Amino acid sequence: MRKVVVFAVSAVLLGAAVFFAVKKPSLFLSKASQTRPSFALKGDPDAYEKSTNQETLAGDHGEAEGGRLSAAEEEYQQRAYPADEIPFSLTQNAGAAFDQAVGRGQGANVGQWVLVGPSTATQPGILNFTGADTITSGRETALAIDPNCQVSFCRLWIAEAGGGIFRTDNALVASPTWKFVSGSFGTNAIGALTYDSKNGILYAGTGEPNASADSEAGVGIYKSSDGGDTWSLLSGSTSAFFGRSISSIVVDPLDANTLYVGSTRGVRGVSSVSSGGATTNPPVAAPFGLYKSIDGGATFTFIWNGNGSARGVNDVELDPSNHNIVYAAAFQQGVWRSTDGGATFAKIFSPIAPTYNTDRAEFAVTALPDGKTRMYVGDGAQGTPRAKFFRTDDAAAAAPAFVDLTTSGVANYCTGQCWYDNVVFTPPGYPDIVYVGGSYQYGEYGGISNSRGLVLSTNAGVAFIDVSWDASSDTTPAGLHPDHHAVVVAPFNPYIFFDGSDGGLMRSSGDFKNQSALCAARGLTGSRLTVCQGLLSRVPKKLYNLNKQLSTLQFQSLSLNAADPKNLMGGTQDNGTFEYSGSSVVWPQIIYGDGGQSGFSSGNPALRFNTFTGQASDVNFQNGDPTKWVIATGPIANSPEGSYFYPPVTADPNPTMAGTIFQGSQSVWRTQDWAGNQAYLEANCPEFTTAYNNPACGDFVQIGPAGATDLTAAGYGNRDGGYVAAIERAVSDTGTLWVATGTGRVFISKNADAADASSVTFIRLDSFALNAPGRFVSSIYVDPANPNHAWISYSGYNINTPAQPGHVFEVTYDPLAGTATWTNLDGGTGPMGDLPVTDLVRDDVTGNLYAATDFGVLTLPAGTTTWESAGTGLPRVEVAGLTIAPGARKLYAATHGRSAWVLQLP
């Protein structure tokens, strides 16, 4: 995948700037999880009842059942490969290696990283479920509100999955002012926020616990006594939680030194591509589970293993009437209770899907007027049985009796991804009020419900109303983003709720309007009409979008228009693909879904492509017009081959081959005319209404000898398995293609442009060099002056391939001798250390290399052996991809949580 704008070197191309796109983290998508959630058309509220295609539309508006969890395991496996585990010391050493490189300073004239946005990521109504224009930001994992919040001064903290912590003191205005407050953290992946208002202490647990492919691991717990202006790391939290993700922090209301902390498995790193096999979690680092501190976090004691959960403890609360009673939920294990401060535990609620390690129970406890404790529980996994909702009014009883309250208003509330988006919240002092959030009901919205993404009960869970859309318009209302993770309310009004989701933050007005009359207009009758009328009987009058100023998108990649270095596209986690045209404030969304890679044609920037998850990709012939995207990879998606979650894709950087796109699964697939005839594709394969695996949409074909196109097969020797992980074309000719797999195989083809796809041949190069690592290949950068010369980066750790250490190599293929050499560039006077690299680009003007890592960007100046910091000012954040424009002297970084940044090169 090209990540550079290159100025042509031949007479034919003299003066022409040619380019292609970068890459993004690519994760495995099993064949079983390739269907897409439904997408009803704007203006056709009953499309969910009429369409037969809705489960296979390309735009990925939800998490494929099982996909996010298996992908999370693959992100972990990417770092571990070829071993099964990542030892605790390696993740610590990687961070230390990065810090050492930064500590060496920076080279002359290397400047300051600048945020290029967006701070206002706009989504046009045509791409939104409700039809209303909106603004989005990155995934939020936790919220905390000051109980002294009033209309005139309301302090709210929000936690981002990869973007840190932001604070506002005017949370109740239409557009709050946000301040980033976690710049000193060792990671900006946040999983938990707890405000001890009695003592004025804010706790932040690092590492996201939501079991997604990019749920990044943390480094421990930070503490602030001034609202987040300054922080200190709890000394005992590093050994207990480094490399883990924190789900809950609970402070004993009678003893501020007593803390209970739940931890889960986390993922270290979002890279350009992802590994194949998933494994169980071995006992590395500190075990995940439930910990207790009695000295304010100076030390932590492991008190419960989640009864052997393979995922960890996802929820912890104390009984409101007895602080010695501890409730905890663990993946696949239901809800447990301790009556002796955590010394012993017993199960009180059994999971509904005990055979799935994806089963996740979320609960909330509240005090009843009679002194007893009520507990609400939402539980589900993936597939069947569908998610259910329960309540007991005496959680402290010897054997609590849970009543199944799974009515149509709350049934299947988190669909097939309860392990990812699942929240149950009851406001303190309002025991009959409960909010339940999960994912969109894609087959219902605009029909029997407004999606039921977030529902509210005011009668203790007996009945629910749908608060996912507001009443500001009957036709284009404001709505909540799918995938909900956190809810809090204004302390003086339990109906003013703040909702944190994959799309950022929304707030309700706190009052309601009856919109049940809309149900009949939707053509509903009988019981369906009755259900709809109940759900829409109290709809929020207004939902406020609070995402302005939040530059927290989780970019997977950035691509660049060769004709204009200020024109970018970038794919983001669950927020689609956005376009940058010079403004660091506003980037419009040009297509929805889980955005992966994107790119422009090297010959005509009006031709674009984007990828969703799996093998679903679109092309566009009309400058990215949101209504003109067409399905392009039907033949690939309809094939028996598997791929990574975001398969590698690259368009040919040579303008004479401007219609060619390559995409990797197990084979390399190719189109030579931008996926087919424009008129045919626009007439028969529009993105909004076409199944993503329609074999008639797109003309991609496998390249390579008949019967031997699969580059991961055993027929090519050792290191078999995995999928194609990296593809890169040489700009200086028309036929050289470099390809790598997730197991460390590296190939070169010298005739990838052959008209007869079956005549394309591949030569395996890694087998020529004893020092070529058998680890995950994260990127390839081809020398624009020599198609047989490239730089290759590797993920993983040297300890797993001790005879083949290294993360950055210079590789030269000698076609006459039939040999290839690998030169390790990690070492020297300033070694990189055992630091996985997520992406690599080269400044072809100076020869400097730039490496993206889990912690930031490093550079190796030409002619030196010293890796050092690439500029200053970039937050501590995982960098998923780099895109360079040597002629314009710009290096762009796609960060996974702090949006997009640029470094002006010397």
Walk through the language-model features, giving the residues of each.
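Beta-propeller blade termini and top-face loops
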Residues: 31-906
